[in-house]
Amino acid sequence: SRAAFRGGCQGVSAINTIRSIMSVNLDTLRPEPTVEGFTTPGGYSGKAVRPIALRMVMEIATMIRSEFPGRSLSGLGGIESGEDAAQFLLLGADTVQVCTGVMKFGYESVKRMCDELLAFMEKHKFETLEDFKGKSLDYFTTHRELVRMQGERKAKEKAAAAEKAAAAEAPKKMVAADSEWSGDEFVKQSDALARG
């Protein structure tokens, strides 16, 4: 994508099908599916590629933000519902494309997907796609940073628990002189004195 943008491209799409081999028949020892006993790597598509497509869209959208503002990204790869489309948009896609989903469910599925996307938008009170495009990008970081944040949280929890335990074990201040008796606190002070 970077090379395409450097070359003057105004937009890219991600991802197409992933070249794949479905299997090898262990009886015939031939790859499958076969045509006249032979095969060729084909395109792996549908919802199985969605996690890969989402990662690629996130990475490209992040690059566009920092290096090529104003360029566009169309997300595709496993979109079968409006919720799927929303995920691509949240990760920075400007538009989405559907192929395998329509092949599986028919052209009428496009209206369903649009209705589902609109329901998502209404739920979150988004009026336009721009209101949420790329909104999830700010929540990505490095593995190192995740470990640091988790360690920091655990250290704070441990310190708070130790402070609470120390407060629970600390001796209660006893009344040492008549002048320390309080009218409002007399019952509590008496109980504390009796318990030792």
Q: Each predicted region: which residue ranges?
A:
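Short, surface-exposed acidic/glycine-rich loop or hinge patches that mediate macromolecular interfaces
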Residues: 78-79, 103
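Short histidine
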Residues: 105-196
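C-terminal helical cap(s) of enzyme catalytic domains, especially alpha/beta-barrels
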Residues: 21-41, 103-126
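Short beta->alpha connector loops at strand-helix junctions that form conserved
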Residues: 99-100
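Alpha/beta enzyme core
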Residues: 1-74, 80-95, 142-172, 179-186
